[in-house]
């Protein structure tokens, strides 16, 4: 079947492209026995934009359960947050570790 190039609608397939949402990743802080609780709260407030109350709740969850989710993001944002938190922890001589895992 020959296309009629004078009529663009004859060569353009009608329909919508279906885009899947990007995969999401959980950014998780891992508890350790050396990082002060107030430093964890500072990290949560600075990098995850939590208010004092929410940061304290998440910090206690991390302390009690051994780990806690700080946020859920697309891959590139999650990678950036993990790197920023781990770099900040090292700069402040704390072993606090941040990781990400697929949701």
Curated annotation (Swiss-Prot):
TM helices/strands, residue ranges: none
Cysteine-cysteine disulfides: none
Gene3D superfamilies: 3.30.1390.10
Gene Ontology biological process terms from the UniProt entry: protein catabolic process; proteolysis
Subunit structure as annotated in this protein's UniProt entry: Binds to the N-terminal domain of the chaperone ClpA.
Function field: Involved in the modulation of the specificity of the ClpAP-mediated ATP-dependent protein degradation.
Family: Belongs to the ClpS family.
HAMAP family for the chain: ClpS (MF_00302)
NCBIfam families according to UniProt: PRK00033.1-5
Protein known as: ATP-dependent Clp protease adapter protein ClpS
Organism: Nitrosomonas europaea (strain ATCC 19718 / CIP 103999 / KCTC 2705 / NBRC 14298)
Gene that encodes it: clpS
